[in-house]
Amino acid sequence: DVSHPVMESIYNQYYQEPRYRPSTITAQRLAGGVVGKKVGEGFYTYSEGKANMPPEPKLPSVKEFPPVWVSPRASRRLELLQLLKDLGANIETGASPLPHALTLVAPLGFDVTTVAVVERLDPARTIGIERLFDDAATKRRVLATNPATRSDMRDAAHALFARDGKAVSVVRDSGGFITQ
């Protein structure tokens, strides 16, 4: 119930910059009095003052995990390699990935597609992982596919990074990860 007025204020402070334009849906819901935790509706539905979170998607079933190759340009690469080791991944250490390896990139400020092209990686096997923050400081890991990522590679990455019980979100490629 306070979000829409704040979004309108920001939009107006930036001289109606289109990228800050609030959604018309929030204006309509606010006018109708059907938005906000107090009325039980909003981004989530609420019951007894708590958000009803959607259930986590079912983890993909993976019979055999491919070896994992991490880009030398990956942000927080050493931490990522340690995480993979802790998760029991078979880490590939060659200068370039073998043809059957899952290829991991951890871009900062770039999309997965661009990184795959610049680094000349096979986009069908390339997945991005959010590494802006230390893994211990987060409740969720975020993976990003590019338009060419194979479903078996997506599923292998999802299952691998969820091995320790931490929640994993798989998103489509975009101009940057959620926290960037």
At which residue positions do the language-model features occur?
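N-terminal glycine-rich phosphate-binding loop for ADP-containing cofactors
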Residues: 1-180
